[in-house]
């Protein structure tokens, strides 16, 4: 470290970054071939501090804390507070476990894969995608309905690991810490409570095939995908530290939960059961492993999903918030599209209420909101690029119900016109 002091001009040292001489600064730090002054060091520290403010607060292990994970989930996913808490804790503990494994050998911490149960359109897939974004780890999604046992037409379960490798640019080390989300997991349930005497290659067979990679095994993955050949070279991927999140709507599971413990009887002496008026998401909260077994999942598969998070039905208020509040909310997306035509798109508050009601009637949850919005704005998006000076498009409740056309406000005349969309 060179301190400020007098000296000849020939021997004067300069900061390699800002060009100031050693006489103009308090301290000049010398490297092998460069010098940096205390002012440039302070500037670098300011930049790093600013970046740290915008990033997640980390725990001592360098992993986002459960509260911070939950907070970021709130930015993208509306509602589902209990599911967010369960996921935040499970994911935090999983990556804490990975750090622990490199430091201690006395206690081995087991992996806790996650099962998400909730009605369609309640946010299962979005939660998994957002988690991967928060943690900056490789993430891939697989559809359980396309999977079959090895040797049959369809995708092998090893293809899931191949997709994870592709998401990590074939960095095996990074892929081995990734997250896999398997959607439609309820579709691979076996068709009856009793083990089948015939081969069920896309149901129970897939559950059996998934057991080893979910628990932890070294999978041989063909780099180019497809079926395995004897002459082909394989990549060896250890799945022990890959977090598996399985999600499904589990249609019909609510009936199994509701009737649990009540028994069944027929004939004149049978007890008439009162209908269960609770919402599906509310019933799901009472789910037990035995209910999943009755639904058609095999015991070994249920045992490998120790963490169960249930999602609620989205009500009208939640659907309305989904339209406007998240960072990538639907209304914001369409407003950005209209901005590209130099037009402002605005929705009246009552119009958003009607959109939410329509989604509830369709029973498609948040997933149905986009199709409703497309139907409302289709004609406007078709005509708008060919119209001049449309400053604003206003959508009211009558427009959503199909009783009237959007209101156009023109910049030239500065007057309102109910011109056809």
UniProtKB/Swiss-Prot annotation:
Disulfide bonds: none
GO molecular function per UniProt: ATP binding; ATP hydrolysis activity; ATP-dependent protein folding chaperone; protein dimerization activity; unfolded protein binding; zinc ion binding
Signal sequence residues: none
UniProt-listed CDD domains: RecA-like_ClpX
Residues of the ClpX-type ZB domain: 3-56
Binding residues for Zn(2+): 15, 18, 37, 40
Pfam family, one: AAA_2
Keywords, comma-separated and alphabetical: ATP-binding, Chaperone, Metal-binding, Nucleotide-binding, Zinc
Gene Ontology terms describing biological process: cell division; proteolysis involved in protein catabolic process
Binding site for ATP: 119-126
Stored InterPro entries: AAA+_ATPase, ATP-dep_Clp_protease_ClpX, ATPase_AAA_core, Clp_ATPase_C, Clp_protease_ATP-bd_su_ClpX, ClpX_bact, P-loop_NTPase, Znf_CppX_C4
Entry GO CC: HslUV protease complex
Function field: ATP-dependent specificity component of the Clp protease. It directs the protease to specific substrates. Can perform chaperone functions in the absence of ClpP.
Family per similarity comment: Belongs to the ClpX chaperone family.
Subunit structure: Component of the ClpX-ClpP complex. Forms a hexameric ring that, in the presence of ATP, binds to fourteen ClpP subunits assembled into a disk-like structure with a central cavity, resembling the structure of eukaryotic proteasomes.
Protein name: ATP-dependent Clp protease ATP-binding subunit ClpX
Species for this entry: Methylocella silvestris (strain DSM 15510 / CIP 108128 / LMG 27833 / NCIMB 13906 / BL2)
């Amino acid at each position: 470290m060179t301190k400020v002091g007098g000296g000849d001009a020939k021997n004067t040292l300069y900061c390699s970054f800002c060009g100031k001489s050693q006489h103009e600064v308090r301290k000049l730090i010398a490297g092998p071939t460069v010098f940096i002054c205390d002012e440039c060091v302070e500037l670098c520290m300011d930049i790093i501090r600013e970046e740290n403010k915008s990033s997640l607060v980390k725990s001592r292990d360098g992993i986002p804390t459960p509260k911070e994970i939950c907070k970021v989930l709130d930015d993208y996913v509306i509602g589902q507070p209990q599911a967010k808490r369960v996921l935040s804790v499970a994911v935090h503990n999983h990556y804490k476990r990975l750090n622990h494994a490199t430091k201690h050998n006395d206690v081995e911490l087991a992996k806790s894969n996650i099962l998400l149960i909730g009605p369609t359109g309640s946010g299962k897939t979005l939660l998994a995608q957002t988690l991967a974004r928060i943690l900056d780890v490789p993430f891939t999604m697989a559809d359980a309905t396309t999977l079959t046992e090895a040797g049959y037409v369809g995708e092998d379960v090893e293809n899931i690991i191949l997709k994870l490798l592709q998401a990590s640019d074939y960095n095996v080390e990074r892929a081995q810490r990734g997250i896999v989300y398997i959607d439609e997991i309820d579709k691979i349930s076996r068709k009856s409570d009793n083990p089948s005497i015939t081969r069920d290659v896309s149901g129970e067979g897939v559950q059996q095939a998934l057991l080893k990679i979910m628990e932890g095994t070294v999978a041989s993955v063909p780099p180019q995908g497809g079926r395995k050949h004897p002459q082909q070279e394989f990549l060896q991927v250890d799945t022990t530290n890959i977090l598996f999140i399985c999600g499904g709507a589990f249609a019909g599971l609510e009936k199994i939960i509701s009737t649990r413990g009540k028994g069944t009887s027929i004939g004149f002496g049978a007890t008439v059961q009162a209908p269960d008026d609770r919402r599906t998401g509310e019933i799901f909260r009472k789910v037990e492993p035995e209910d999943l077994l009755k639904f058609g999942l095999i015991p070994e598969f249920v045992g490998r999903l120790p963490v169960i998070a249930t999602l609620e039905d989205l009500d009208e208020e939640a659907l309305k918030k989904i339209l406007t509040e998240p960072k990538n909310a639907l209304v914001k997306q369409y407003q950005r599209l209209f901005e590209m035509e130099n037009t402002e798109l605005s929705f009246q508050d009552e119009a958003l209420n009607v959109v939410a009601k329509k989604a509830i009637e369709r029973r498609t949850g948040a997933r149905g909101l986009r199709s409703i919005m497309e139907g409302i704005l289709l004609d406007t998006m078709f005509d708008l690029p060919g119209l001049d000076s449309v400053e604003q498009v206003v959508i009211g409740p009558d427009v959503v119900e199909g009783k009237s056309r959007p209101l156009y406000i023109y910049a030239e005349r500065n007057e309102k016109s109910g011109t056809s969309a």
